[in-house]
Each structure stands twice: as C-alpha cells, then as structure tokens.
Amino acid sequence: MIVAIIQARMDSSRLPNKVMLDLCNEPVLWHVVNRTRSSKRIERLVVATSENSSNDTIREYCKQKDIECVSGNENDVLDRYYKVMNYANIKDDDIVVRITADCPLIDPELIDEVIEHHIVTNSDYTSNTIEPTFPDGLDCEVIQATVLKKAWEEAKLKSEREHVTLYIRNHPELFRIESYRGNEDLSGMRWTLDEEEDYILIKRIYEELYSNNKMFTTKEILDFLNSDPNIGAINSMHTRNQGLTKSLKEDGCTEEDLKKVNKNG
C-alpha cells in the first residue's frame, strides 16, 4: 500500500493560518489534498495535524470533506507521522509519501515519477529535494514504512523530530537513499507557501490557470511565469529552507553544515 501523509497546521509563525487561505474559493489544504489524490500511485491519503486547539479548523474541515485526519504532537512531527502509521495500519513493506500542506502547486505526475523511481531503485528513501532541480514547493519524499519507523525509534535531535526525514538523510550509511532530479534546474523558483509574497504569487497563478484546468500542470505554470518575469519575482526575496535552517541552528549546527543544507535542499 502507498499512503500519502500531508502534514498541516494553523500556527505558522511566518504566515498564520496559511493552509486555510483562499485559492479560487477553496482553501489551500483542499488543493493540496486534491492534487495529491490525483496521483495514480497513491492508494490512501491522511492529513496529519497537531493536537493544539488552533487546529480544530483543520479537523472540522477534514471531517466535512471526508478527508482522513489524525492529530498528534505539535513539534514532534515525526511522532505525528508514526501515529498516522498506526492509525492506518501501515505495514513495514508499505510506502509512505510525505507531502506538506504549504505546497498547493504540488504536481501529481511528479509524485508518481518519484514513487516509480523509488520502487525501481529499491530505495529506502527517495526525494526530489536532496539535489534540488524542481521549484521549491514541488517537494515529494517517498519512504519505506520500516525506515520511517526506525527514524521514529532512533532520532534524538529536535530538528530530526520536527523535520520528519532528517534522521534518514543524516545517516546515508544506514539507508539506501536516492535523489530524483529533473532534466532542467528550476530550483531557483519558489512555489511554496510560507510568506505573504508567496501567497500573492500562488494566488496569481491560480487566478490565471485554475478556471481552464483545475489540475493545471507544471508546464502551464512555467509558461505563465515565463510570459512575465515580474510575476515570478514577487517572492524572490525569500530563500529556501528557512524553517529547517532555524531548527538546525537551535541544534547547534555549524555554518559549514548550514551551507550544505542550503546547497542540497
């Protein structure tokens, strides 16, 4: 079984309530769920939110829309994933696909490509963020359930508990890790939703493309942005991996290590 787990919460320090912001009369979370469900390989989808009362909106919305939702620890997101694994009765040989709710432009075809690469290479962990070539916001991680369980058992650093797969990436000697790369380096593009400027950009994209094709493609986004470079520059002042960098600093990560993170996604 291949299960997508979408982590979502309301208490974002940089853009509060971002997962419920409106995009063409539907909240961001709905679009992330809908686009992820359009994957041909994913068989089940569960939203993983925090137990904090601020996330009651997410729980109520998921119930209303018949979306499976599990609540767990606010900061120990790895434990939240493990709780979903138990809830969904995920077996050791099953596959977990990690998606975050700040990616309303997530590409279902790309999700399938990463899953296929994971299976063909017999990998423990496969991601398109290890050597970034895709726009920030098309992030997809595919993990063997038994490996995610080991990470839950062994991860000790706060950053490894908050950033679910960091323990795996920190221990390439223990796991078969595969990087999925695109044919063109588009890693300088920012399509994630963390700042007000990100929302302005993504809203423009939806207003332009959604009415003609509700499952608009990465190519359509690129064509639109290439038609007017000023649009893509709306959020260009923000950098990749700001949240991860903050967590690593709190764990005492060196400047040299931080440079590696920002280089390798």
List the predicted regions and their residue ranges.
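Short phosphate-binding loop-to-helix
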Residues: 51-121
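Short active-site loop/helix that positions an aromatic residue
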Residues: 200-207
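Short, conserved phosphate/pyrophosphate- and ester-handling motifs at nucleotide-, phospho-/glycolipid
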Residues: 195
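A short, N-terminal amphipathic alpha-helix
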Residues: 28-45, 58-60, 64-65
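Conserved core of the sugar-phosphate nucleotidyltransferase
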Residues: 105-189, 220-265
